[in-house]
């Protein structure tokens, strides 16, 4: 049997030579939701304001949400933030971004970020496949 590293929980998981792709999305969303609730429940004014600013920054404006999410995806990839990449991938997917558009944006991110972002590109591609599988 083979072992695969779960990119969400960084633990070994034994499977029958398959990665259960839908688990990638579910595990990410479950963990993110749980931890965001805890962070917000702590009632830290700065954290709450940052969350609020982030939400408002991605709202419809001169740029549509789809474009803003692609910008967030590129920036997150260049900054090598896997959780941020996953979040922007999922939101982009929900906004109707196509695989071709996502890959073009990720190509720009790889160009700007250099080869050090290639591992993040791989994980992003894997997460996108999981999103498509979950249709």
Model regions and ranges:
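Residues in soluble alpha-helical coiled-coils and helical-bundle/repeat scaffolds
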Residues: 58, 79-80, 97
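Acidic, glycine/proline-rich low-complexity segments that act as flexible tails and inter-domain linkers
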Residues: 2-10, 14-67, 117-135
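Alpha-helical scaffold segments that form or flank carboxylate-/histidine-based iron centers
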Residues: 67-76, 105-112
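A general alpha-helix detector
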Residues: 53, 70, 87-88, 105
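Iron-sulfur (Fe-S) cluster-binding segments and ferredoxin-like electron-carrier domains
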Residues: 88-99
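Amphipathic C-terminal alpha-helical segment
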Residues: 81, 112-119
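Short, thiol/selenol-centered motifs that function as redox-active sites or metal-ligating centers
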Residues: 71, 75-87
């Amino acid at each position: 049997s083979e072992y695969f590293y779960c990119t969400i929980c960084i633990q070994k998981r034994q499977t029958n030579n398959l990665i259960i792709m839908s688990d990638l999305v579910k595990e990410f969303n479950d963990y993110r939701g749980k931890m965001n609730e805890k962070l917000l429940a702590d009632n830290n004014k700065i954290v709450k304001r940052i969350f609020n600013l982030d939400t408002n920054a991605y709202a419809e404006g001169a740029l549509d949400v789809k474009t803003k999410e692609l910008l967030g995806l590129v920036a997150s990839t260049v900054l090598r933030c896997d959780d941020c990449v996953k979040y922007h991938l999922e939101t982009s997917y929900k906004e109707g971004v196509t695989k071709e558009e996502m890959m073009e944006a990720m190509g720009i991110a790889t160009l700007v970020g250099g080869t050090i972002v290639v591992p993040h590109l791989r994980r992003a591609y894997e997460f996108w496949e999981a999103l498509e599988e979950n249709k």
